């Protein structure tokens, strides 16, 4: 009962702020036209980012659609709808909504599947909110952030041993389609040692959303997770909100002192949603059709993850980045690499060979690994990569029998150790290996390979 009273009191705080503002008349506008995804209204007094209801009462069944103000030109205001526009006609009323855009938060979110507006998608009814918070969280002074100094055990041998992740790090999973991104995210969800896991499924096929929750995440993984899903058929504004909402959830729990794992699939769909919105309101395209606002929004989203101030919680974030045609120079992939603390590249060649997880350790890097592991561990990881790379350089010669043993001691050693190195990099979907076990296995592998 005490919890309910506390929750009710906190919820009232948001309404208190709204009603304490001086009362002003609501100035409605009228819908002039709709071009593509954009609504154009006139006679409206609303700031960019504010919400409105577009109401058509002329038909047999009144229609009401929520929209957000995205821009203006003179007396005209441009809005982007959140839902379907079926039934909206010229002359529809555009009514500004009071600024009560607060979202429900609380421990009751664990095990739930929500949309970008905080509504339940799992059929389990509404949540018991402990707090109501705005979509945009407070920014942290970069000089006050606690530095990344502690390793995070993700339960995946190749990452723990060779690409060690630090608690509070932000990484990208770069890959084309069908090489095991979602499966790798599912393994991280089940095996990572984190207090709370927040999963954002942005712009994925509806079928994949259910498959990820039921088969990859599983019942045990869902118990300590919050899933925010916005399928590909959602409006671009809803996809954008879903990415921001799951980040806000992670921030909320970090501010409560929790160590949070944030998994977002995918950052590319977030950028594409912003591209749809920007082009619809007339922003000129730039690199490969992406307007400048896309590249401005990426760091704003990513920078919200990371460590809090000393003594607080952390957000370790993994963002998947789709590389069109496996092109690592895709503009979104290139921009993401510049704002992330490392990247894991998934190789189609390895996936086709049945090598899972298909992490290309030569093309991947964890920029904070030197700060979170011992010097001996770092040397072993570098030595492993040297031997693996030496074998890959001579792979064609070895496969056709053109390499003569004894020609190069390093290549001879790489050939001798290749079977155990390949076994080290492979891992079953239900197999977990701790950071300490991965470290010991790496040291043992290299000790056996050095005469």
From Swiss-Prot:
GO cellular component: cytoplasm; type III protein secretion system complex
Binding site for ATP: 175-182
Signal peptide bounds: none
InterPro entries: AAA+_ATPase, ATPase_a/bsu_AS, ATPase_alpha/beta_chains, ATPase_F1/V1/A1_a/bsu_nucl-bd, ATPase_T3SS_FliI/YscN, FliI_clade1, P-loop_NTPase, T3SS_ATPase_C
Keyword Cell cycle: no
Pfam families per the UniProt record, alphabetical: ATP-synt_ab, T3SS_ATPase_C
Known EC number: 7.1.2.2
Gene3D superfamilies xref list: 3.40.50.12240
Transmembrane segments: none
Listed PROSITE patterns: ATPASE_ALPHA_BETA
GO molecular function: ATP binding; ATP hydrolysis activity
The protein's role, per its UniProt record: Probable catalytic subunit of a protein translocase for flagellum-specific export, or a proton translocase involved in local circuits at the flagellum.
Name of the protein in question: Flagellum-specific ATP synthase
UniProt organism field: Pseudomonas aeruginosa (strain ATCC 15692 / DSM 22644 / CIP 104116 / JCM 14847 / LMG 12228 / 1C / PRS 101 / PAO1)
């Amino acid at each position: 009962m005490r919890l309910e009273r506390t929750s009710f009191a906190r919820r009232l705080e948001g309404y208190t702020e709204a009603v304490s503002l001086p009362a002003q008349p609501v100035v409605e506008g009228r819908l002039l036209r709709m071009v593509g995804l954009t609504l154009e209204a006139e006679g409206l007094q609303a700031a960019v980012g504010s919400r409105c209801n577009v109401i058509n009462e002329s038909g047999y069944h009144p229609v009401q659609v929520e929209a957000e103000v995205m821009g203006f030109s003179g007396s005209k205001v441009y809005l982007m709808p959140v839902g379907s526009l079926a039934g909206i006609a010229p002359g529809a009323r555009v009514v500004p909504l009071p600024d009560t855009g607060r979202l429900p938060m609380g421990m009751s979110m664990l095990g739930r599947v929500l949309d970008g507006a905080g509504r339940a998608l799992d059929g389990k009814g509404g949540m018991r909110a402990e707090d109501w918070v705005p979509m945009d969280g407070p920014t942290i002074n970069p000089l006050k952030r606690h530095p990344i100094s502690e390793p995070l055990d993700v339960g995946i041998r190749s990452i723990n041993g060779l690409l060690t992740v630090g608690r509070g790090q932000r990484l990208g999973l770069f890959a084309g389609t069908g090489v095991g991104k979602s499966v790798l995210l599912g393994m991280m969800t089940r095996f990572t040692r984190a207090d709370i896991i927040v999963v954002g499924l942005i712009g994925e096929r509806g079928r994949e959303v259910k498959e990820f929750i039921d088969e990859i995440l599983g019942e045990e993984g869902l118990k300590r997770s919050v899933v925010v899903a916005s399928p590909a058929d959602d409006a671009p504004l809803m996809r954008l909100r879903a990415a921001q909402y799951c980040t806000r959830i992670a921030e909320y729990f970090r501010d409560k002192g929790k160590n949070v794992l944030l998994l977002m699939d995918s950052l590319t769909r977030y950028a594409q949603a912003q591209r749809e919105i920007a082009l619809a309101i007339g922003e000129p395209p730039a690199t490969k059709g992406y307007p400048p606002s896309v590249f401005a929004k990426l760091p704003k989203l990513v920078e919200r993850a990371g460590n809090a101030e000393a003594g607080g919680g952390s957000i370790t974030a993994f963002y998947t980045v789709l590389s069109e045609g496996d092109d690592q120079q895709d503009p979104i992939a290139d921009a993401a690499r510049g704002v992330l603390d490392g990247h894991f590249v998934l190789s189609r060649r390895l996936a086709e060979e049945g090598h899972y997880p298909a992490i290309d350790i030569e093309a991947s890097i964890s920029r904070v690994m030197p700060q979170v592991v011992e010097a001996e561990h770092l040397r072993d990881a570098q030595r492993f990569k040297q031997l693996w790379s030496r074998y890959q350089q001579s792979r064609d010669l070895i496969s056709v029998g053109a390499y003569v043993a004894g020609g190069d001691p390093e290549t001879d050693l790489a050939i001798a150790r290749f079977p155990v190195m390949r076994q080290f990099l492979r891992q079953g979907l239900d197999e977990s290996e701790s950071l300490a076990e991965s470290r010991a296995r790496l040291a043992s592998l290299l000790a056996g390979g050095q005469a």
